[in-house]
């Protein structure tokens, strides 16, 4: 497929512009309201250590890394992230929010969300403090084993969408499944996202799944290839419209580089720490304030 000769970030900016100009106005579960389109695709090269951390406004890099590692450890207690200064799950883990969606659990217990499904699919969820060692299907371990043993497989798929558990989750998965592909010694990842908040969520998700691909490539001795992002409902919250109109006027800058530099033995994805990743050359435009709709 021919590459867009423009900066790859224009894919994101053009999609935002398209939604602002053509999106259907809808009310949503948060009560904020959105402009929405259905069906979109973006592709980002990860070759030569390229890391597609958007530059037209600052993306919370530490949050990207810490949340991904939180998922890879199978953790579900938002307070683990909050202690690291990452508060992206704080609203959804609040006791009041949990009660509002019919969940009676301790503050911060997010339920069987992404990490639980990735590492223990099919296990019975109890609490965020329970041990699930050896329980359920470890989809991440299975995917890594398949990449090593049968890289041509078309079945290297990980799903966070478990209908049995949806009612127990603080928030059902927005990014519901991903698939790995190995071609010519390069690992690529395609992710399907049923619901994409273009202001806050999607820039974060692009970086998160790119990082996941880079990490798994490191573990399997491959080179990172490409991240492909499929979106179902791609939307702009109405209270983000002015901020995004400002953002799409900014010219993209060069994407930074990301290097995996482990500070100790890292044989499994859950062994990695924030300090094992080195971000070089990130020079974004200033942050733009946007509210989170919970």
Curated annotation (Swiss-Prot):
| Residues holding dUMP | 29, 154-155, 194-197, 205, 235-237
Extract the InterPro entries matched here. Thymidate_synth/dCMP_Mease (IPR045097), Thymidate_synth/dCMP_Mease_dom (IPR023451), Thymidate_synth/dCMP_Mease_sf (IPR036926), Thymidylate_synthase (IPR000398), Thymidylate_synthase_AS (IPR020940)
Pathway field? Pyrimidine metabolism; dTTP biosynthesis
Q: Which Pfam families match?
A: Thymidylat_synt
- Give the main EC class: transferase
Catalytic activity from the UniProt record: dUMP + (6R)-5,10-methylene-5,6,7,8-tetrahydrofolate = 7,8-dihydrofolate + dTMP
Which E.C. number(s) belong to this protein?
2.1.1.45
Gene3D superfamilies annotated for this entry? Thymidylate synthase/dCMP hydroxymethylase domain
Give the GO molecular function terms.
Answer: thymidylate synthase activity
GO cellular component terms given for this protein:
cytosol; mitochondrion
Active site: which residues?
A: 174 (nucleophile)
GO BP annotations, alphabetical order: dTMP biosynthetic process; dTTP biosynthetic process; methylation
Alphabetical keyword list: Methyltransferase, Nucleotide biosynthesis, Transferase
Give residues annotated as binding (6R)-5,10-methylene-5,6,7,8-tetrahydrofolate. 197
HAMAP family recorded: Thymidy_synth_bact
The record's section on PANTHER family has: THYMIDYLATE SYNTHASE, THYMIDYLATE SYNTHASE 1
Give the similarity note.
Belongs to the thymidylate synthase family.
- Name the record gives this protein: Thymidylate synthase 1/2
Organism per entry: Encephalitozoon cuniculi (strain GB-M1) (Microsporidian parasite)
The gene coding this protein: TS-1
């Amino acid at each position: 497929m021919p590459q867009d000769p423009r900066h790859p970030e224009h894919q994101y900016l053009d999609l935002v512009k398209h939604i602002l100009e053509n999106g259907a106005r809808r009310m949503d579960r948060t009560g904020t309201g959105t402009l929405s389109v259905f069906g979109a695709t973006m592709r980002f090269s990860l070759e030569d250590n390229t890391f597609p951390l958007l530059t037209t406004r600052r993306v919370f890099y530490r949050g990207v890394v810490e949340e991904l590692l939180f998922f890879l450890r199978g953790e579900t207690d938002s307070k683990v992230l909050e202690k690291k200064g990452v508060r992206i799950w704080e609203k959804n883990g609040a006791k009041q929010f949990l009660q509002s969606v019919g969940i009676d659990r301790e503050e911060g217990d997010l339920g069987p969300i992404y990490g639980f499904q990735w590492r223990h699919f099919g296990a019975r969820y109890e609490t965020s403090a329970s041990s699930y060692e050896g329980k359920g299907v470890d989809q991440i371990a299975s995917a890594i084993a398949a990449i090593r043993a049968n890289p041509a497989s078309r079945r290297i798929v990980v799903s966070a969408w478990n209908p049995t558990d949806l009612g127990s989750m603080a928030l059902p998965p927005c990014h519901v499944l991903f698939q790995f592909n190995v071609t010519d010694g390069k690992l690529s990842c395609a992710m399907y996202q049923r619901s994409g908040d273009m202001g806050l969520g999607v820039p974060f998700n692009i970086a998160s799944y790119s990082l996941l691909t880079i990490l798994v490539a490191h573990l399997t001795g491959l080179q990172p290839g490409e991240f492909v992002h499929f979106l179902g409902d791609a939307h702009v919250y109405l209270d983000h419209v002015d901020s995004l109109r400002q953002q799409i006027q900014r010219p993209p800058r060069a994407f930074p580089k990301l290097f995996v530099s482990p500070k100790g033995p890292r044989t499994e994805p859950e062994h990695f720490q924030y300090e094992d990743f080195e971000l070089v050359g990130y020079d974004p435009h200033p942050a733009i304030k946007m509210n989170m709709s919970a």
